Amino acid sequence: MQTPRANYLLSCGGCHGLNGVSNSRLVPDLKDQVGFFLNLPEGRGYLGRLPNVAFSITTDEALTGLLNYMVFTLGGASVPKGTKPYTLREVSQLRRQPLTEVSLVQMRQHMVRVLIDQDHATTNLRRYGENDYRSPPSPQDQ
């Protein structure tokens, strides 16, 4: 069985970057930002129901490890205190209800507005709701 980091690198790193910093203006960074979504109940579900997550060819167990790696390792300080890890049962249920009938960009933009309005997230998360999703690179990412 592969480690969650290895699964991330194989399944997500090509678009979201090896350390969670995307090389594309159209793909959101995960590093120090993905955890903000866990301030909202729908945000937690959103992460587990994204089509590339829900339809991934990995097992529920591996996907649970992958989501927890993304949130707790890549999410850094953006993860709310007291956040519980995803459970196998939760991930199994979420991926059976994939987001397919909604605009993912509109849904993400709405959550970003709510998070910023409620002071759950820094304003650099606003980039998730704009055309240029990239956060400024940190020195260690350059």
Range-by-range predicted roles:
Residues F72-Q142:
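Flexible coil segments in periplasmic/lumen-exposed cytochrome c-class electron-transfer proteins
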Residues M1-V21, N39:
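Sequence/structural segment immediately N-terminal to covalent heme-attachment motifs in c-type
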Residues S11-G14, L18, Q33, Y46-V53, ...:
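Structured segments of extracytoplasmic/periplasmic soluble domains
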Residues V21-S56:
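Gly/Gly-Pro-rich "capping" loops immediately C-terminal to redox-active cysteine motifs
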